[in-house]
Amino acid sequence: DIVISIDPDELTINFFDFLTDTSDLLLVYNPAVPNAIPKAFPQRRIAFDSEVYLAEWFIKHTEKKGNLGKISSVAHAAVKFSQFLACSPIILVGQDLSFCQQRLHCFHSFYYDEHMDKVSRLNPRTYWEHMKISKFGPNLTHGMDLFGKRVVSTIAMESYNYIFSKKFKGLQNVINSTEGGVPIEGVINISLKESLYIYCRELVKDKKNSFRTTQLNENKIFKPFQDSILRQIQLLKDISGKLNTLKLKFLDQRTPGRKGKELFVKGMEILYEYILENKETALLLQGYDFAGFTDWYRSNYQILRKKELSEDCSLLDEEFERDLKFFDVLVGSADYLMVNFEKALTH
């Protein structure tokens, strides 16, 4: 059995109980996932190169691990890895991508259990399921499942369906035997019973080979890699220190006056120039909070456009609001990266 983990968000840890014996499991993971996850699979794990910049940074300072290509979910990664192993056929059995009546997540999943924790006599399970589905509003879509039964999905879930269709369309060895949800266009869609009857007449355990991974020295940290991490931590500490100085000067008391706003905006401009002196650091910060950086780019573009249209207009308040929001983005990004780079030194 193989476990796939790709999401660097700390929330990913909640999907693992860390009590189950993992000696018979193989972890295939993005190196940017929380460290507790690969640590739970000693000697039984394979990392693959990811497209996020944090993973690229690790590749640059260690070694290439191999790439599964562009992936958008655990399921896509699993299919890609199965193709890498030359598995045939590859049978999908869990890609419902729709609601089961009003239930979104499968039983015993992290999200479903979290949902069930809210159940009470006054607010039963059906109440919470209705609240969940009602949040999607105009994003709800309708379709037919494999057996001609009407199902409800969302635009987001349909996008995952489209990715499967685009990547695996026309492949005769990728079979979708998920009996709920909208069938995946371009691949073979048949019932699970048919798949088992046609393709699974021989027990896998009778013909499988033991999957061996390279024995690793858990305590070995290559010195060049360690030095790279230490340099990056120092750069992040410098940025964090400059942010703290700006906070003490302009943000710890009441809203600054005009002069204070001018100095804060100027201080942030100097900080941007400092960050951009090291492209790696800038990309790492952006990779942690891409949405925050996008908001800054959008706000900055709007301000520059207004200045082009009217050279005499004062946009100090807008510049201050732009930089104030981005200040929090930089603080969060720098703190997160510092903590996790420091963790990397201890494992």
Task: Go through each PLM region and give its residues.
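Acidic, Ser/Thr-rich peripheral helices and adjacent loops at domain boundaries
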Residues: I4-D7, F18-D24, H108-W128, L192-L203
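Acidic/Gly/His-enriched mid-domain segments of enzyme catalytic cores or analogous surface patches
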Residues: D1-S88, K306-H347
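Polyanion-binding loop/helix "lid" in catalytic or ligand-binding cores
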Residues: S72, L122-G180
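A structural signal for short, well-ordered beta-strand segments and their strand-loop junctions
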Residues: V28, I90-G94, Q101, N173-E179
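Active-site gating loop/helix substructures
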Residues: I46-F48, V52-K65, F107-Y112, D117-R150
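Long, compositionally biased charged/polar accessory segments in the mid-to-C-terminal portions
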Residues: S159, F168-H347
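Glycine-rich phosphate/pyrophosphate-binding loops
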Residues: D1-V3, D7, S82-H108, N300
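Conserved catalytic-core helix/loop/strand module for nucleotide-ribose chemistry
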Residues: D21-L54, I133-G148, L263, I270-K307
